[in-house]
Design a protein with these regions (language model features):
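Bacterial N-terminal signal peptides that target proteins for export
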Residues: 1-15
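N-terminal, motif-rich segments that launch catalysis or mediate targeting to/interaction with membranes
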Residues: 28-178, 185-333
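N-terminal signal peptide c-region/cleavage motif recognized by signal peptidases
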Residues: 24-26
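Short hydrophobic transmembrane-like helices used for membrane targeting/insertion
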Residues: 18-22
Length: 333
């Protein structure tokens, strides 16, 4: 792909223009809507040289023809560039169950226990990867990294002297996705119990939540905070512009971009998981399942207050992720 001409001023106005030409997409979940929002926020924060370098690298991606060729309906160069960066943010989900898939890269299961007694009993027996340092010889082919390690690897390889342009492009796509992942609290934490969740609740995937039409799970609830849009549609772009118009959120983003360590981002998400995601009602439901691990945990009906807090947390985390992603991609040389 030819390096694009990015000689235009960064800002939020360009987000609004795309509304006129992008049609609504099919249903999906957070990892489309949320990740594309992170990418759009990041794009608004990048300077022109960074945009040029990032788009140039994505033009060298080994799957550029399949995943990074904008739809013909997008004629405006600026809109095509936005589509490409938002596509980079979902590429790692598009290649799931292929040889490029790295399932463990998306999360880390920092433990949450029902009590101090449970922590003392269970922690020595945990079999989870909580490492923050890369194993010796780690590469983009290494399967069993956690999200902290994966981010560290991609940042290292992004400017490694022996890295090919194709490898660096893959690093960009992973970073566009993983920076979003690590800001979703359920990607940082799992609840561990002595009987039912000895191996963890998979970031809330095994905790049922009462839904309007059918029950979902805790992880899905948080994944769904930004709706079910598979592609870049007008509503999604309007929401990105609204996030960037919120002074409090922008202030939070500016504070966040000063802290660029993946371990710090996980620690923030873990605190949110502990303080917001795993509410007293959810912990009580998990605890009730310990008496009979074979019996289904009762679905938790979340309160209006919980929903409001979740919405506020999700909005802030997406903005923080976008600001940080812009700073990380500024490392591209």
């Amino acid at each position: 792909m030819r390096r694009p001409n990015c000689s235009w001023r960064p800002g939020t106005a360009c987000l609004c223009a795309i509304i006129l030409v992008v049609t609504p997409g099919m249903a999906s979940a957070w990892w489309d809507s949320g990740h594309r929002l992170v990418a759009l926020v990041a794009w608004s924060r990048m300077d022109v040289p960074t945009r040029t370098r990032v788009l140039g690298l994505l033009g060298e991606h080994p799957q550029v023809e399949k995943y990074f060729t904008p739809p013909a309906r997008l004629q405006d160069g600026r809109l095509r560039h936005q589509w490409i960066i938002s596509q980079a943010a979902v590429w790692s989900d598009l290649v799931r169950k292929s040889d490029r898939d790295r399932p463990t890269w998306h999360y880390i299961n920092r433990p949450l226990f029902l009590s101090e007694k449970a922590r003392r009993s269970l922690q020595p027996r945990l079999r989870v990867n909580l490492a923050t340092r890369l194993p010796k010889g780690a590469s983009l082919a290494t399967q069993d990294l956690n999200v902290i390690q994966a981010i560290s690897l991609c940042r290292q390889r992004l400017n490694a002297r022996d890295a090919t342009e194709a490898e660096r492009a893959v690093c960009v796509t992973w970073l566009c996705h993983l920076v979003g992942d690590v800001h979703q609290p359920c990607h940082s934490t799992a609840s561990f119990t002595a009987r039912r969740f000895l191996r963890g609740d998979r970031g809330g995937n095994d905790v049922p939540i009462r839904g309007d039409k059918k029950d979902i799970n805790l992880h899905m609830y948080w994944d769904g905070q930004f709706g079910q849009t598979r592609t870049l549609d007008g509503d999604l772009v309007r929401r990105a512009a609204a996030l960037l118009a919120d002074r409090k959120l922008v202030a939070a983003g500016r504070r966040a971009e000063k802290r660029l360590q993946g371990e710090t981002w996980v620690a923030e998400s873990h605190r949110l998981a502990r303080d917001v995601v795993y509410s007293s009602a959810i912990l009580a439901a998990i605890g009730s399942g310990e008496s009979d691990p074979e019996k289904a945990i009762p679905a938790v009906e979340l309160s209006g207050d919980y929903a409001r807090r979740a919405r506020a947390v999700a909005r802030q985390r997406v903005v923080e992720a976008g600001f940080r992603l812009a700073r990380v991609l500024a490392e591209v040389r």
